[in-house]
Amino acid sequence: MESESESGAAADTPPLETLSFHGDEEIIEVVELDPGPPDPDDLAQEMEDVDFEEEEEEEGNEEGWVLEPQEGVVGSMEGPDDSEVTFALHSASVFCVSLDPKTNTLAVTGGEDDKAFVWRLSDGELLFECAGHKDSVTCAGFSHDSTLVATGDMSGLLKVWQVDTKEEVWSFEAGDLEWMEWHPRAPVLLAGTADGNTWMWKVPNGDCKTFQGPNCPATCGRVLPDGKRAVVGYEDGTIRIWDLKQGSPIHVLKGTEGHQGPLTCVAANQDGSLILTGSVDCQAKLVSATTGKVVGVFRPETVASQPSLGEGEESESNSVESLGFCSVMPLAAVGYLDGTLAIYDLATQTLRHQCQHQSGIVQLLWEAGTAVVYTCSLDGIVRLWDARTGRLLTDYRGHTAEILDFALSKDASLVVTTSGDHKAKVFCVQRPDR
């Protein structure tokens, strides 16, 4: 099956009020860039100094890991399949995937079957099951040094496992889980819950700190690259930038500064000076992490809007599903539920390209050190786009249902996907331009 024709808008497309500014601010002048990344040892030491509250130890689930038979690994499937390895031990939709950051040789996946597995990318061999969850596993990830792996289910049960020993070392029950992320430099786990709290734990001793938001779910969050702050988005449209050591908000954006609907995603640029936030209100806001001011608002192009409807008809919903910054050019990408991938030029404050998919975008990721952006969508296809030209470089197929999550190896040689077809797949990325 040949890929459908998908085009990007020409670079000379005039700006169609895709970006609005507050007052006389300009992006380049508002933001003061940090001199460079902090020393990892200093960050780890700072996290040691954080005043955590002592939590009462709860009885953990003592179930051990279970070794599954190798027949769960599938080499190929009927129909076009570009993948090298298919992991097939899940018995329901696979919601999440993460790669170990140190070696990029292991994956952890979690699914609707209440299971999470750690397995090897090269051949799909199961290393161990993260047993004991009683609800869909929606979050999973490795610590910064790949020694620990955390899994979280919808009910709020979080578990952490020592990778080399395959043993559970920590467990905690929070409220209904919205998101989870490891600290970039220390064995510290953060999570947002439906009661509006953001939690931070030292692992494995369990020392805990909470950051209380508004009385609504903390729908998305991200630790900033300096490791000292986190940005959290909430269901009521507010955005908070937290000081992790002090436990207090540095900036709060609400009302017209915030969003007019629940936040769906947040991202930060490489030095943490700029933040992008996305919402079901179809807007992506560019925020200075230093001043807490909104310096730009990106809105969907008119091409993506729905035609006028007759009486009694409802318009199709659209929302920002994923976004991110390019690491080598002043570009940002925003992916929408209606299938639009918009590439914005931050230097000229204009829409650079608009790339249309046949179905909704689920997630996008920028390749490190290049201007290539990857998208996965509800049609089960991974696509690679050149953000400089808006051109589709290639695509990868093999799933028989929507892709729900994907991860990219550091050297961009592997893409690992999870899907509603109960499978996780490993694709080898081959590009003649590198």
UniProtKB/Swiss-Prot annotation:
Localisation: Cell membrane; Cytoplasm
Cystine connections: none
List of residues that carry Phosphoserine: 20
Key words, A-Z: Angiogenesis, Cell membrane, Cytoplasm, Developmental protein, Differentiation, Membrane, Phosphoprotein, Repeat, WD repeat
CDD domains to which the protein is assigned, alphabetical: WD40
Tissue: Expressed in metastatic melanoma, liver, skin, kidney, heart, lung, lymph node, skeletal muscle and brain, and also in A2058 melanoma cells and activated T-cells (at protein level). Expressed in blood vessels. Strongly expressed in endothelial cells, cytotrophoblasts, and poorly differentiated. colon adenocarcinoma cells found in lymphatics.
GO molecular function annotations of the record: heparin binding
Pfam family, one: WD40
Residues covered by region (Disordered): 1-63
Cellular component, GO annotation: cell surface; cytosol; intercellular bridge; microtubule cytoskeleton; plasma membrane
SUPFAM superfamilies per the UniProt record, alphabetical: WD40 repeat-like
Gene3D superfamilies for this protein: YVTN repeat-like/Quinoprotein amine dehydrogenase
WD repeats: 89-129, 132-171, 173-212, 214-254, 258-299, 315-354, 356-395, 398-433
GO biological process: angiogenesis; cell differentiation; positive regulation of endothelial cell migration; smooth muscle cell migration
Comp. bias (Acidic residues): 39-62
Function text: Plays a role in angiogenesis and cell migration. In smooth muscle cell migration, may act through the RhoA pathway.
Protein name according to UniProt: Angio-associated migratory cell protein
Gene expressing this chain: AAMP
